[in-house]
Design a protein with these regions (language model features):
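Class I SAM-dependent methyltransferase Rossmann-like catalytic core
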Residues: 32-41
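A short acidic, Gly/Pro-enriched loop at the edge of an enzyme's catalytic core
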Residues: 119-130
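N-terminal, positively charged/glycine-rich alpha-helical extensions of SAM-dependent methyltransferases
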Residues: 1-32
Length: 138
């Protein structure tokens, strides 16, 4: 059962993730972040690359992206490092958009999406080799 703030977040962000990005926001994202993933967050490309190195992401490793929204930086990290990623968030719309992005990036076989709150993740201990939690409103 979702608590009130999770319901509010789901409603707010489902609407936001359902809107297509404008040309202006995509250009701004390319200039500021260095990538175009749908104006989803503020983690730069350089920061994402640093995370990949620090987490030692590579083929065969499993990454959990908590509060992934439209999939940035989790999908980027999976593509760049060849790891497997599980995206989690409360709003389904963001995860649907992320799954579409995974198809565009050619990584659907190494990515999945689960509607889940960070308060109650449905995974056992030691399921993942690394976890990222970026640009999440807590």
């Amino acid at each position: 059962m979702r608590i009130r703030d999770e319901q509010d977040a789901s409603a707010t962000f489902s609407e936001r993730y359902g809107r297509p990005g404008s040309d202006t926001t995509r250009e701004l994202e390319r200039l500021v972040i260095g990538a175009d993933f749908g104006a989803n967050g503020y983690t730069t490309l350089a920061q994402a690359d640093l995370m990949a190195r620090m987490l030692r992401l590579r083929k065969g490793r499993r990454l959990l992206d908590v509060g992934s929204g439209r999939g940035w930086p989790g999908l980027y990290l999976a593509k760049a490092s060849e790891c497997t990623v599980v995206l989690t968030d409360i709003p389904e719309q963001g995860l649907r958009t992320a799954q579409q992005r995974a198809a565009v990036e050619g990584i659907t076989e190494r990515s999945s999406a689960v509607v889940a709150s960070a308060r109650r993740l449905p995974f056992g201990a030691e399921t993942f080799d690394a976890i990222v939690h970026t640009d999440v409103l807590c």
